[in-house]
Design a protein with these regions (language model features):
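Blade/loop signatures of beta-propeller domains
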Residues: 34-50, 149, 212-222, 278-295, ...
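Short edge-strand/loop segments of extracellular domains
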Residues: 144, 254-260, 264-271
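Loop-centered beta-sheet repeat module
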Residues: 198-207, 216-248
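Acidic, Gly/Ser/Thr-rich repeat motifs that build Ca2+-stabilized beta-propeller blades
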Residues: 34-190, 239-242, 247-255, 305-343, ...
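Conserved blade-ending motifs and adjacent loop-strand segments that build the rim/top face
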Residues: 347-367
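Bacterial Sec-dependent N-terminal signal peptides
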Residues: 1-36
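Beta-propeller fold detector
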Residues: 52-55, 89-96, 150-157, 215-219, ...
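Beta-propeller blade signature
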Residues: 137-147, 197-209, 265-266
């Protein structure tokens, strides 16, 4: 009888422990559920367009641009550079060796604003060159001749290398004055790189078109500083675009779990990572208890929960009257395109486009005025208004 009583008590204690465990799990999940108070509502899409496949068979299309004759140049993350004409893709030869690991690989591609005269194409990719094992983000320029890259010039290589697979960035954009900006993520060393201007990574860089350092860069002459740095305190910027209406460079970056940001890039500005963040770590623990601090630039908008943004483009085309003057951002996580409605530098509305299309890696407005989206596993699609 005594033994039976002990067994019953043990079973009861197990049940009580299970109940308490469930309660604490519920409390933990509830407390860590990410809700942004007074957020701008995300409107459902109004499908007044059709989608047309421009080219298929590109598994992770990352960057895209257009030659003067309308030929597209597309990067595929694993390390293939394509030119696409009339739906047919052809591999461009003589690409430097790409370090294809994790989130690294062949990344962005843009043309020089005066491409018709000088023929320069700019590319970022992860490279093994330099100090240490692994790789880091590199910027080159080259010319295209007879389907092959020639006159390849190294413009900047972040260092040291690391075998970590995350946060390479990278996007490239020219401003109205002809300076080139490119991004490099913090390579997974968020307590080391982003806040230290003597180290690469977690930065937006600004260079002359030949890779030299502009004399008015903010950290020129500062002892030990990487003089190419224009802004710092970034996590993993995968959106970079010049606002055609103001000339300012806009950026978006991945937060951790929550806290993806849209920022307007300012000279010498600190964007806070990881000192401040609106997100939490992937295990639910806190990275920082603060989301704002003096002398740290606040984002003009942040997503909570994360959408995992990739690619961004301002719409200037008359083909899309309801979208003109606003911003498009791809979502990897939720697999749609987000129309971010603007009133000058203020976000006033949000709307879904191309719902369930797949992981949107990039978005761009072509020289023909159409919007093109790069979707993982599908290739490049064109949005045609009805």
């Amino acid at each position: 009888m005594y033994i039976l009583t002990i067994i019953k008590n043990i079973k009861l204690m197990k049940n009580i422990t299970l109940v308490y465990s469930s309660i604490f799990s519920f409390i933990f999940i509830t407390c860590n559920a990410q809700v942004k108070l007074n957020d701008i509502p995300l409107q459902d899409e109004v499908k007044n367009y059709t989608l047309e496949t421009v080219v298929s068979g590109i598994q992770i299309p990352w960057g895209m641009t257009w030659l003067p004759d309308g030929t597209m140049v597309v990067t595929e993350k694993t390390g293939i550079l394509y030119q696409v004409k009339d739906g047919v893709k052809t591999e461009i030869k003589n690409l430097p060796k790409v370090y294809n690991r994790g989130q690294g690989g062949l990344l962005d591609v843009v043309l020089h604003p005066d491409y018709k005269k000088n023929g320069w194409i700019y590319i970022t990719y992860s490279s093994t060159e330099g100090e240490g094992d692994g790789g880091n983000t590199k910027l080159i320029r080259a010319k295209l001749q007879n389907g092959s890259l020639i006159q390849i010039e190294s413009l900047y290589k972040a260092s040291p290398n690391t075998t970590k697979g995350q946060h390479f960035g990278s996007r490239i954009v020219f401003d109205k004055e002809g300076f080139i900006y490119f991004s490099a993520g913090e390579r997974g060393d968020h307590f080391v790189n982003p806040q230290d201007i003597t180290r690469d990574n977690g930065k937006i860089y600004r260079l002359n078109d030949d890779g030299s350092i502009p004399k008015d860069n903010p950290f020129v002459g500062k002892e030990g500083a990487k003089e190419a740095i224009y802004s710092y305190g970034h996590r993993n910027p995968q959106g970079l675009a010049m606002n055609p209406f103001t000339g300012a460079v806009w950026e978006h970056e991945h937060g951790p779990q929550g806290g993806d940001e849209i920022n307007i890039i300012k000279k010498a500005a600190n964007y806070g990572w990881p000192v401040v963040t609106y997100g939490i770590d992937y295990d639910g623990t806190s990275i920082s208890t603060e989301s704002e601090k003096p002398d740290i630039e606040k984002p003009i908008y942040y997503w909570l929960p994360s959408i995992a943004p990739s690619g961004m483009a301002f719409v200037t085309s008359d083909r899309y009257p309801d979208w003109k003057g606003h911003l498009l951002v791809g979502s990897l996580k939720f697999q749609y395109l987000e129309l971010v409605k603007l009133k000058k530098d203020t976000i006033i509305g949000r709307q879904k486009i191309a719902v369930n299309i797949g992981r949107v890696r990039n978005v761009a407005q072509g020289p023909d005025g159409y919007i093109y989206i790069a979707v993982e596993g599908k290739g490049i699609l064109k949005i045609i208004p009805n």
